[in-house]
């Protein structure tokens, strides 16, 4: 875990120890952290923040393909550049098959990671609350995808 992440977690801990409202929003904690001088944007973070905002905007750009499907236009792929892994973005209309395959594999890995973490969280919650009906999560998304595709075709 990075030092910066630990710093952010420490701010949350300090917020809670200060007896401020909980549960709360990240914005409320941010307002408190800025007001109390616990956080300010480091100069090195400005470039990273700008890049993150640009990446978020690129992730939200869509087009309609020839079959009428809403498709994400720009896709990142982790590529080795000058000895460092960097997310390189390309346009789905002009990107190489190799770029798209790497991008899709990377996205799938992220989805699997999210599912794994959800399973750990659900298992932990269930273990901590054995007296309650256990929460069950199905990780086979085939039916969900089929239903969404059927709804798209019906529209």
Features from the language model and the residues they span:
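Phospho-regulated, low-complexity intrinsically disordered regions of nuclear gene-regulatory
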Residues: 1-8, 46-155
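DNA-recognition alpha helix
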Residues: 10-14, 25-40
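Amphipathic alpha-helical interaction segments
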Residues: 19, 36-41, 57, 61, ...
């Amino acid at each position: 875990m990075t030092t910066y992440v630990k710093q952010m977690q420490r701010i949350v801990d300090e917020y809670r120890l200060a007896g401020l409202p909980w549960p709360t929003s990240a914005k409320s904690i941010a307002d408190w952290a800025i007001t109390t001088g616990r956080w300010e944007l480091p100069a090195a973070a400005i470039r990273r923040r700008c890049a993150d905002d640009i990446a978020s905007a690129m992730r939200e750009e869509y087009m309609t393909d020839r079959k009428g499907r809403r498709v994400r236009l720009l896709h990142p792929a982790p590529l080795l550049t000058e000895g460092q892994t960097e997310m390189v973005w390309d346009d789905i209309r002009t990107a190489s098959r190799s770029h798209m395959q790497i991008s899709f594999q990377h996205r799938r890995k992220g989805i699997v990671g999210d599912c794994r973490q959800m399973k750990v969280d659900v298992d932990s919650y269930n273990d901590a609350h054995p007296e309650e009906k256990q929460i069950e999560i199905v990780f086979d998304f085939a039916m969900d995808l089929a239903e969404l595709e059927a709804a798209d075709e019906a529209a």
